[in-house]
């Protein structure tokens, strides 16, 4: 939600009190000018005065500035921060962030490695450092791994988004022959345009009003793996989406979590989830493989 004035924030604060739902304010620019930090700190203090204590930040220097000014608000490290790895957690540990939001480009194994590293460091009882206790991963919408810090594509009405062009990702250590065996016919990443058209002709998964859960990116099949890796929170992207589509996304994600809780195996979960949410097929815009 874009907030245009402080009076709108006050209205939102009253809604938070009424419905008892957490709201995090976002300062998601990749960097701010040093002369802006004082003003941002003042704005954050104003927001804290009406009950907003949690902030998502993408500018590392802003976090350092806030801690230097003794502003002890709750901080979530944004998925647009640039790089998320074990070494990065060491850099930020002294600034005591509460949550790390993993980027779209992070694989599940990379998330697991970072969380395991943090767990090991906590057990080492380095009292002067405070590591994150919450870990968030993308679950629905906006597949593009280059969003935010890594986006170099031209976005305009006249041209399609570069991230919507069929593509595939390749680990640099793999040879071409091994890659072909590992990546062959994996839809969403390396599917050809002709294959995509052929698949679309068989069934149309989009509803009559244009809605399809996870149409621009979906990680629902991986929720069991994310949970096992240590992910505690899921991110559902709503920016630019229709309000009613966003509401349906939320309901579908909640239902998916219920199905996951009732399933004894990952295979059973995926089968039941797809049967209920995607009876005519899904978007094939998968976050992870």
Where are these regions (language model features)?
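Active-site pocket-lining/capping segments in soluble small-molecule metabolic enzymes
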Residues: 1-87, 101, 106-289
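As written
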Residues: 96-97
């Amino acid at each position: 939600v874009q907030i245009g004035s402080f009076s709108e924030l006050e209205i939102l604060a009253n809604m938070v009190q009424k419905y008892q739902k957490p709201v995090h304010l976002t300062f998601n620019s990749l960097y701010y000018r040093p002369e802006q930090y004082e003003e941002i700190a003042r704005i954050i203090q104003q927001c804290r005065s009406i009950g907003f204590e949690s902030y998502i930040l993408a500018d590392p220097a802003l976090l350092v500035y806030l801690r230097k000014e003794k502003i002890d608000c709750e901080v979530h490290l944004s998925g647009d921060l640039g790089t998320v790895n074990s070494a990065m957690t060491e850099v930020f540990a002294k600034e005591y962030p509460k949550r790390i939001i993993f980027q779209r480009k992070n694989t599940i194994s990379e998330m697991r490695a970072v969380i395991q590293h943090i767990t090991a460091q906590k057990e080492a009882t380095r009292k002067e450092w405070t590591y994150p206790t919450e870990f968030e991963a993308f679950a629905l919408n906006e597949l593009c791994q280059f969003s935010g810090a890594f986006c170099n594509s031209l976005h305009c009405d006249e041209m399609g988004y570069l991230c919507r062009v069929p593509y595939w990702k390749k680990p640099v250590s793999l040879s071409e022959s091994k890659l072909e065996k590992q990546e062959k016919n994996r839809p969403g990443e390396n599917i050809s345009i002709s294959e995509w058209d052929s698949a679309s002709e068989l069934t149309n998964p989009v509803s009559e009003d244009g809605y399809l859960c996870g149409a621009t990116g979906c990680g629902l099949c991986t929720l069991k793996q994310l949970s096992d890796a240590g992910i505690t929170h899921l991110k559902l992207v709503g920016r630019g989406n229709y309000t009613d589509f966003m509401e349906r996304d939320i309901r579908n994600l909640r239902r998916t979590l219920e199905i996951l809780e009732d399933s004894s195996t990952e295979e059973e979960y995926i089968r039941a989830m797809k049967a209920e949410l995607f009876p005519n097929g899904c978007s094939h815009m998968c976050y992870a493989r």
